[in-house]
């Protein structure tokens, strides 16, 4: 296809015009000067004479024509040339026949032969618009013409809209010398019948694109959708997708839904069912754990004596502090295998099913954690979730079954875990029968009172504003009014506590220690008894406890170091040791002595609890005392070293024995001078419902006393 020659040199002047390409238009205005081309045929010259610039307005073309009709000394400047862009004062003088550097663009590389000719400002020639559609059209081109690259048609089948190349060729070859030639005018007025490699839309043939809004193509509906129709389809798209869904799409959708439902079942439903245990469909056959193979005859299994037949004869007596022999009045050797202690199972012991909230324990006391194995009672603590708590343990108590009033209580035990590890709370202790351990409503106003005066000591907070006491006052005081609720009016009653052992750890020296204490109320000033009446026998192993009490109890306590072999674990562990108390409750010569093994650790004499401040004498307990054996764990007791507590841990009890003077034997919970049975029976709600925390919650009220109740008592008179 012939293009305008940008490389050949052509000099022209106003006198060197082709006669076939000159003349006036129909208005008489002079036409633009057209240079003659020495190496181009006449047909090509004539074809280009009538062309106009499609990208210039009529005013711009008129100005261009006026500029072309100036003096012949001014050379012709084609529209769009580089020279036209220069300012008038600095525009290049094109009248000088100075050469321009050779063209070195794309076409110079593709047609090197055309570049070899001299450059003589031939770029001033008007653009050449001949179009070639086939090689035959270019047969008359000279070797200096630059050929365009092969035509690329993106849409080879665009229909009749594209002008045929034959028609274009006809327009390109029609003569243009006649001003009235309609064919030439039609061709020159159509800006899109120019060379095919030019397009204002990015380099493709202009004839291949629709340029008018009314032109239509077969794929217009894809590019110009109807908004209303699209909106209607959008509203029904979900329904139509299902309505016109083929089998393959339906099967794919079903597969996706199936995978989604399977994922929900596997990752949500199945874990929930597994966690709740809803799918643990075990057989209906009840599993029974046999604690022992021993067969007990129904009648011979009943013990007829408080002293266990398995107790050796050498243990039938015990020597007291004064050298007298006290006789054995009760014993339990726990030699029978598989004993259980649910309520009603055993005549002497009960394993309660409670949470010990009084000390904010972390375990739940469950009856199934207390049983007899290998000739011992075992209280087992597991990291086993129970009743919303994460630990389960055992407690055994003889409340309202076996009690004693003064005497000696001896217990042989192997303590749990390691002695050097802090956290566990093993306990061997006693408490007055008017309070049941773990049942807070029953203990309110009686624990740990041991008081026989009618003064500030029986009032709430001891009538002291300094916060020494948070107790509600003594419920069963000595001066209870006539007609009030009292087990035996005229006697001060309570539920004091004596601890044979509470296990803890001395973390500085890494050994276990035994806290042995008396818990009483009301309290001394600063919780300090008279230490002139307290004996410590060996200060290398026993010292008075730095903890002397708090607003809920006064604790007269001493701590003694223990051997690491007396614990469950350890290189030499597994040995048993006996712990004991010995006490007499005489007001003048009474005492309490504690033992580790056969060695006494310290003694409190009755005179250590003399009047102090606005309170009177605290007495060594005259109440019938029940026995409690338990293994607990609580942050209120000691730092818990979790990583070294190896659950399950077990406190083993070899035996429990009670000794009393032969002239003062009382192994009952309802002695005549300190009765408890009738009182308990008339207030069973407080003693059987562990969820009740106050006496009022159980439905009862504190009895009035003559000190604060404005009433009288026939059993007690205030001294003047």
From Swiss-Prot:
Transmembrane portions of the chain: 253-273
Biased composition (Polar residues): 1-17, 31-51, 69-90
Glycoprotein as UniProt keyword: yes
UniProt KW keywords: Cell wall biogenesis/degradation, Glycoprotein, Golgi apparatus, Membrane, Phosphoprotein, Signal-anchor, Transmembrane, Transmembrane helix
A Pfam family recorded for this sequence: SKN1_KRE6_Sbg1
Annotated ranges, domain GH16: 289-664
Stretches of the chain found on the membrane's Cytoplasmic side: 1-252
Membrane topology: Single-pass type II membrane protein
Region (Disordered): 1-90, 117-142, 167-189
Topological domain ranges for the Lumenal compartment: 274-720
Residues recorded with modification Phosphoserine: 81, 116, 133-134, 136, 139
Main location per the UniProt record: Golgi
Molecular function in Gene Ontology: glucosidase activity
InterPro entries cross-referenced by the UniProt entry: ConA-like_dom_sf, GH16, Skn1/Kre6/Sbg1
Superkingdom of the source species: Eukaryota
UniProt keyword annotation of Transmembrane helix present: yes
Stretches with biased composition (Low complexity): 133-142
Signal peptide start-end: none
Biological role: Involved in the synthesis of (1->6)- and (1->3)-beta-D-glucan polymers of the yeast cell wall in vivo. It is required for full activity of beta-glucan synthase in vitro. May be involved in the maturation and transport of cell wall proteins (CWP) to the cell wall. May act as a transglucosidase and contribute to the construction of a protein-bound glucan-structure that acts as an acceptor site for the addition of (1->6)-beta-D-glucan at the cell surface.
Family: Belongs to the SKN1/KRE6 family.
Oligomer status and interactors: The cytoplasmic domain interacts with the actin patch assembly proteins LAS17 and SLA1. Interacts with KEG1.
UniProt-recorded name of the protein: Beta-glucan synthesis-associated protein KRE6
Organism this protein belongs to: Saccharomyces cerevisiae (strain ATCC 204508 / S288c)
Gene name in the database record: KRE6
């Amino acid at each position: 296809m012939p293009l305008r020659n940008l490389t050949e040199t052509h000099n022209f002047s106003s006198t060197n015009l082709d006669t076939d390409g000159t003349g006036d238009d129909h208005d008489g205005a002079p036409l633009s000067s057209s240079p003659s081309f020495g190496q181009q045929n006449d047909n090509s010259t004539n074809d280009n004479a009538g062309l106009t610039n499609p990208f210039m307005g009529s005013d711009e073309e008129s100005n261009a024509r006026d500029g072309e009709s100036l003096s012949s000394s001014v050379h012709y400047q084609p529209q769009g040339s580089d020279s036209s862009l220069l300012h008038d004062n600095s525009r290049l003088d094109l009248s000088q026949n100075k050469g321009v550097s050779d063209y070195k663009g794309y076409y110079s590389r593709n047609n090197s032969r055309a570049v070899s000719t001299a450059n003589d400002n031939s770029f001033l020639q008007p653009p050449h618009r001949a179009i070639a559609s086939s090689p035959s059209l270019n047969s008359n081109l000279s070797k200096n013409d630059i050929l365009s690259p092969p035509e690329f048609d993106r849409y080879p089948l665009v229909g009749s809209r594209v002008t045929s190349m034959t028609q274009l060729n006809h327009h390109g070859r029609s003569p243009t010398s006649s001003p009235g030639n309609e064919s030439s005018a039609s061709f020159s007025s159509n800006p899109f019948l120019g060379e095919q490699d030019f397009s204002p839309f990015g380099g493709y043939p202009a004839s291949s694109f629709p340029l008018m809004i009314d032109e239509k193509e077969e794929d217009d509906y894809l590019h110009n959708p109807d908004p209303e129709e699209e909106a209607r389809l959008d509203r029904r798209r979900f329904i139509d997708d299902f309505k016109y869904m083929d089998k393959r799409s339906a099967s794919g959708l079903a597969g996706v839904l199936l995978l989604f439902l399977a994922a929900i079942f596997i990752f949500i439903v199945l874990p929930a069912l597994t966690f709740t245990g809803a799918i643990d469909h075990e057989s209906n056959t009840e599993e029974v754990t046999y604690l022992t193979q021993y067969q007990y005859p129904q009648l011979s299994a009943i013990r007829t004596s408080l002293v266990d037949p398995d107790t050796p004869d050498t243990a039938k007596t015990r020597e007291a502090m004064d050298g007298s022999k006290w006789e054995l009045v009760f014993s339990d050797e726990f030699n029978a295998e598989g004993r259980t202690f649910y309520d009603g199972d055993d005549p002497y012991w009960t394993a309660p099913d409670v949470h010990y909230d009084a000390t904010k324990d972390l375990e739940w006391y469950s009856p199934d954690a207390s049983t007899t194995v290998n000739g011992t009672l075992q209280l087992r603590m597991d990291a086993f979730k129970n009743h919303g708590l994460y630990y389960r343990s055992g407690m055994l108590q003889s409340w309202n079954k076996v009690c004693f009033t003064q005497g000696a209580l001896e217990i042989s035990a192997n303590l749990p875990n390691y002695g050097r590890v802090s956290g566990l709370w093993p306990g061997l202790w006693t408490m007055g029968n008017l309070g049941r351990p773990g049942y807070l409503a029953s203990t309110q106003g009686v624990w740990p009172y041991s008081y026989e005066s009618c003064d500030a000591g029986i009032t709430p907070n001891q009538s002291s504003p300094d916060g020494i006491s948070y107790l509600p006052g003594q419920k069963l005081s000595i001066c209870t009014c006539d007609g009030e609720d009292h087990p035996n009016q005229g006697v001060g009653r309570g539920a004091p506590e004596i601890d044979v052992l509470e296990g803890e750890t001395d973390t500085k020296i890494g050994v276990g220690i035994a806290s042995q204490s008396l818990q009483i109320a009301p309290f001394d000033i600063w919780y300090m008894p008279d230490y002139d009446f307290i004996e410590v026998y060996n200060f290398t192993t026993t010292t008075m406890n730095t903890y002397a009490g708090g607003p809920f109890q006064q604790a007269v306590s001493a701590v003694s170091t223990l051997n690491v072999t007396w614990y469950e674990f350890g290189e030499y562990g597994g040995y048993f040791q006996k712990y004991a108390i010995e006490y007499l409750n005489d007001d003048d010569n009474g005492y309490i002595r504690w033992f580790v093994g056969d060695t006494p650790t310290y003694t409190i004499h009755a005179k250590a609890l003399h009047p102090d401040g606005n309170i009177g004498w605290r007495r060594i307990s005259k109440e019938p005392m029940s026995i409690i054996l338990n293994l607990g764990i609580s942050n209120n007791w000691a730092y818990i070293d979790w990583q070294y507590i190896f659950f399950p841990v077990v406190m083993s009890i070899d035996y429990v024995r009670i000794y009393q003077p032969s002239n003062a034997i009382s192994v009952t919970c309802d002695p005549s001078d300190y009765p408890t049975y009738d009182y308990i029976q008339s207030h069973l709600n407080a003693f059987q419902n562990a969820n009740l925390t106050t006496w009022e919650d159980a439905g009862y009220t504190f009895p009035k006393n003559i000190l604060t109740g404005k009433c009288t008592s026939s059993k007690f008179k205030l001294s003047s």
